[in-house]
């Protein structure tokens, strides 16, 4: 029997479901979809903050509302608001005393020190929250979610709105947590943000998972782009018109065969290239087809 870190079974509620999913220890799964798809609500159900109308959430086999299970979950909300007058260290101390099971071996100061290292905030420990930039606020969200050695992290838009360097840094920190067995479910309205992080992707639309699978499989489709000297009167079968010319999924045929089809239609081919379909394209296609 597989020991899942997190399971949601037949979850339904207001503008949500039915949804079922399971997350393995050390797995990073990305939840993507347009605004209003239900990503945040599903994460809040998984965290035990919102009760579903039907279905069940379990954390390491325990019901999510079991106090022991709650100690295993860390949640970082989108646009999380922190008390701005506190220092980073004092804020995390407050959360440690409020939410973490402490003991002689797990003193609040030790938990805070560990969370600061995890999030890369040790140098900012004595800074006031209202002096932090966007990237450090996102790191602070990760620190409070991971505080206390949580084994399941639910991260809502933690990578959104960051420059490439800050995003890469946070992705590396999340990946290191996963390498230690922490299960991560992370949402993003920007699918490209998850392409370097998530091993599995779930596409949400109108509160339902409409497509799911390993990222490598979803991104495995090759697309032929053809640049033309003049726009076509009509594209060949299987091609669609783009700003530069045409494109089509190769879907088992060779590049040579696809280009031969273009030439058979007397199209003025200037150049061509093969690219891999992006996660953003997959999300848009899924949205348009449902």
Describe the residue ranges of each PLM region.
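Conserved ABC ATPase "signature" region
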Residues: 93, 106-124
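Short, charged/small-residue-rich alpha-helical element at the C-terminal edge
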Residues: 223-286
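Conserved ABC transporter NBD signature motif
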Residues: 55-69
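Helix-to-loop junction immediately C-terminal to a conserved catalytic motif
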Residues: 47
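The feature captures the beta-strand-to-loop junction immediately N-terminal to the Walker
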Residues: 32-34
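Q-loop/switch helix immediately C-terminal to the Walker
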Residues: 79, 86-100
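ABC transporter nucleotide-binding domain
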Residues: 171-249
């Amino acid at each position: 029997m597989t020991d899942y870190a997190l399971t949601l079974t037949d979850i339904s509620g207001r503008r949500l479901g039915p949804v079922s999913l399971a997350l393995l220890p050390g797995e990073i799964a990305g939840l993507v979809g347009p605004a209003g798809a239900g990503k945040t609500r599903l994460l809040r159900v998984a965290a035990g903050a919102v009760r579903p109308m039907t279905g069940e959430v379990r954390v390491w086999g325990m019901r999510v509302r079991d106090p022991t299970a709650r100690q295993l979950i860390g949640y970082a909300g989108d646009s999380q608001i922190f008390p701005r007058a506190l220092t980073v260290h004092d804020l995390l101390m407050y959360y440690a005393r409020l939410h973490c099971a402490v003991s002689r071996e797990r003193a609040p100061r030790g938990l805070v020190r560990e969370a600061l290292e995890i999030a890369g905030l040790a140098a900012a420990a004595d800074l006031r929250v209202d002096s932090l930039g966007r990237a450090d606020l996102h790191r602070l969200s990760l620190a409070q979610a991971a505080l206390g050695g949580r084994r399941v992290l639910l991260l809502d838009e933690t990578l959104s709105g960051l420059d490439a360097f800050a995003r890469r840094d946070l992705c590396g920190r999340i990946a290191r947590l996963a390498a230690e067995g922490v299960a991560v479910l992370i949402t993003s309205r920007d699918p490209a943000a998850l392409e370097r992080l998530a091993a599995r992707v779930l596409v949400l639309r109108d509160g339902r998972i409409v497509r799911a699978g390993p990222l490598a499989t979803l991104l495995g489709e090759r697309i032929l782009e053809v640049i033309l000297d003049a726009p076509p009167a009509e594209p060949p079968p299987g091609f669609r018109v783009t700003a530069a010319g045409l494109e089509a999924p190769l879907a088992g045929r060779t590049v040579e065969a696809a280009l031969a089809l273009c030439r058979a239609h007397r199209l003025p081919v200037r150049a061509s290239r093969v690219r891999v379909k992006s996660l953003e394209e997959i999300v848009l296609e899924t949205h348009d087809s449902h």
